[in-house]
Amino acid sequence: MINGIDHYNLRSDEKMIETLKDFYISIVGLKLGDRPPFKSKGYWLYAKEKDVLHLSTSKDNIKNLINVNSTLDHVSFSASNKKNVMETLEKNNIFFKERYIPEINIEQLFFKDPAGN
């Protein structure tokens, strides 16, 4: 029985992985945490006590293909202070879109990371 999503992984070359690590820590607010000693270089980023984002270098440190057809549209994080998130995005010149879904009383912010995810 599936209980939910455990984590997601972004894979790219070492330079982009470093850029993504910095973005998800400084902008999104995830924390760097423990990661098993895999052969590939990478990081596990945590929300509270849970690893939610894995970053890993691709085989032979080659940047993954861009513009590959995919059905993945977005990944969603929950946050406790929308105003602070918006201020951080604005301060760092990160374009975002707001959306409110009144039927379920949800406010959303959509933005892209440096790799375009």
Give the positions of each predicted feature.
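N-terminal beta-strand motif that seeds the catalytic metal site of vicinal oxygen chelate
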Residues: 1-21, 73-75
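Vicinal oxygen chelate
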Residues: 1-3, 87-117
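Short hydrophobic/aromatic beta-strand micro-patches
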Residues: 11, 46, 76-80
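Conserved active-site tyrosine of GNAT-family acetyltransferases
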Residues: 20-27, 89, 116
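Short secondary-structure junctions
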Residues: 29-36, 94-99
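Conserved short beta-strand elements that form part of the metal-binding/catalytic scaffold
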Residues: 31-66
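Short acidic/glycine-enriched loop/turn segments that link adjacent beta-strands
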Residues: 37-42, 71, 103-107
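Mid-chain, well-packed structural core segment of small domains
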Residues: 68-89
